[in-house]
Amino acid sequence: MRTVAAAAGVSHQTVSRVVNGEPGVTDGTRDRVLAAMRSLAYRPGAGARALVRGRTEVVGMVVPHDPGFTFANDHLLRLIGGADTELAARGYGMLLSTRETGGGAASAYRRFDRRRLVDGLLVEAGVGADALPDLAASGYPVVVVGYTHQDVPCVHPDDEAGAYAVTQHLLALGHRRIGTVTGPSALASGARLRGHERAYADARRRLPADLTEPGDFTVDSGYAAAGRLMSRRHPPTALFAFNDGMAVGALRWLREHGRAVPGDVSVAGFDDTAAAGLVDPPLTSVSLHSTDLGRRAAQLLFDLIDERADPPRETVLPGTLVVRASTAPPRGHR
C-alpha cells in the first residue's frame, strides 16, 4: 500500500480510503490511486480488485430470515440454486444475505456495496421492497424475484393462473364448497386468491363466503386453519392451501381427526415442493418451476449489469398443475 501511495503521490491513508470506498477523496486523487494500482498490479483484496476492473463478478441475493422456514423451504432453495447456476455459468459468485421479512434490502445493499462487493442485487419476494425503487431509480441493478413490482424489474410466477387451475380442477371434480387457506397478503397470496375467485366466477358458481382462513405459509398455520374450516356447520369437501407447507398441515389435521383424504376431503397445495410427492397421499399442487425462476431472474440482472437496451420490466413464468392422489370427486359424485 505504501508503494502505491508513493507512486500516486498521496498518503497510505488515502490509498486505504480509496480501496475501501470511503468518502473524502477527490475524483482526481482517486483516479491517480487507481492508475498506480493498475501499473503496480497491486492486489490487496477483493475490494481493490473490483475497483481496478470495475466489476466484482459477484451478485448479492437477499432472502427472508426465518430459521423455521427459509432453509426448509424447498421452493426457495430451488430458486437460489437456479440463480446460482446461471451466475456460475458466467463466472460469477453469489453473496447470500438473510433479512427479516418486511424490510432490509436497502441495508443489505449498503453492506454489500460499501467495499464494492457486488455488481447487482436479487431480492426475493418475502424480504419486502419499500426501499428498492430508489435503488433502481439510481441505476443500481436490482431484480425482484417472486412477485410483481411496479417500479423495479421483476421475475415472478403466474400465481393467479396457477390458483385458477387448482380451483378449476376441484370444481370439475364436483366440489362446490372449497375451503382456502391463504398466506400473508403482502406476498403472492393476493394473486392466488384472485385466481381462486375467478375460477368460481367463470364456472358460474357461487363463491362460499365463509370458507377462507388465513395462514402464514407454515405447517402449523395450515393445521390450525384446517381445524377451523372443518369445524364449520357446513364444512368444505375440499381444501386448497396456498402453499404446500400449509397443505401438509391440513393433511395432518385431517388424519388426526379421522378424515380420509381424498375419500372425505380433497386437499391441494401450491409450489410443488419435494414434500408434495412424499406425503401420503401425494399432494396435488402447482409447480412454479422454481429453478427456472431463479435462472431467469439472474439473466435479467445480467441484462441490467451489462446495460443492454430495453430489458423487460416484468417476466411472468407460467406454472403447471400437477394432479396427484390427494384430490378426487366428493362423495356422491363418484
Task: Show the residue positions of the predicted features.
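N-terminal helix-turn-helix DNA-binding module of bacterial transcription factors
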Residues: 1-57, 331-334
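Bacterial carbohydrate/catabolite-sensing allosteric modules
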Residues: 7, 39, 82-90, 137-144, ...
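Short strand->helix junction
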Residues: 22, 69, 185-186
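A generic local structural motif
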Residues: 45-48, 106-111, 128-130, 224-228, ...
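Alpha-helical recognition/docking segments in bacterial nutrient-uptake
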Residues: 58-62, 66-168, 172, 229
